[in-house]
Structure formats: structure tokens, C-alpha cells
Amino acid sequence: EKVMSDFISLNSILVNGKSYKVPIYQRNYSWSKDDWEDLWHDILEIPNDKTHYLGYMVLQPENASKDSYWIIDGQQRLTTLSILCLAVTSLIKKWSVEGIETEDNKIRFDKITERYLGNFSLSKLSIDPKLTLNRNNDDYYKSWLLKLRQPIVLSKLKPSQKLLQNAFDYYFEQLQNHFKLNKSGADLSEFLEKI
């Protein structure tokens, strides 16, 4: 199959109804705080009229219909951006529970989940995750992070799973701090859309 490589934005890759898979032979999630901080600062420096470039990604179609792609290069960045999207949904959900724009934020939560994190399956009547990680990380990603559940004991997690959780915690804290004086679901959604 033909391999594609291009410069793309988060919106162009995730808001297209396609799914992405990390091949089982790819390394575990390994980004750490330095990488998360670099990405966070890159995002904060995006001019208002521009979008963030994900950087270079290499994708290979999994099948002839091209509705699913293998991530040959760029899985660490795409995984991290997916975690950032999860942190956005978690903060919007928190605000909704706190009574901040409750109905609007419920809608935002559902739409962001559908748009960035999963494709709606008519047969299952549920969301199928857009991202499948490697065998060591996928179960944790789908069972804990996608469901916005916090592990009871972090010490029992594999090192790469701890990094996934720590990335989520890092971005949730950054978003809370960034929007603490302006708890606006509209502004938080706009922030996500420019990535």
C-alpha cells in the first residue's frame, strides 16, 4: 500500500471520520513532561488566525477503503494530542457539573468526543475510538483515559501507562490554569479548534 506523509493539523486528521492505529511493533508511549511542555507552549504560541501543524506524520492505509490508517511515524504526538482532547472534555464536563454553562457544555462534551475522539457506529450505537494504541497501551487508553476514569493506584501501572496518565493530568492542570479566570466552554472549544 502507498504510504502518505504530509504536514497536517489536528482538525484535518481527526475530524474526517477515519481511524488511526499504532502498529503493534511500535514502541510504547514514551513522551515525558519536557515533550508535553514543548507541545503546550507551541499551542499557546499559535496566532489567533492560524492552526497548529502536527508536524510530520507518515500514515499507511490499512485497507482499500482508506477509512483506517496505520501510524508509521508520529504516534507519540498524535497520542499526546488525543490526550489533550481528553483533558479538554474532562474540564468541560467538570464545568458542566459545577453549573457553568451546563446545557451548552454537555453539548460541547458530546460533540468534542464525537469529533476528536471517536466515530459513531450505527450498528453498535456507540463511539468507536479514532485512535488505537499498541498492545501495551491500548487497553489503558480505552478503559481508563477515554472513560475519564482515574486509576486508584498509579504504582501498579506499566511505565508507559503512567506516562499516558501523567500526560492527561499535566494537560488537565494546564487547561485549568489557563482558563481559571475565564471558564468559558466556547473559549475552551475555540482553543481546541485551532490546534
What are these regions (language model features)?
Residues E1-I195:
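Glycine- and hydrophobic-rich flexible loops that cap the catalytic core of alpha/beta enzyme folds
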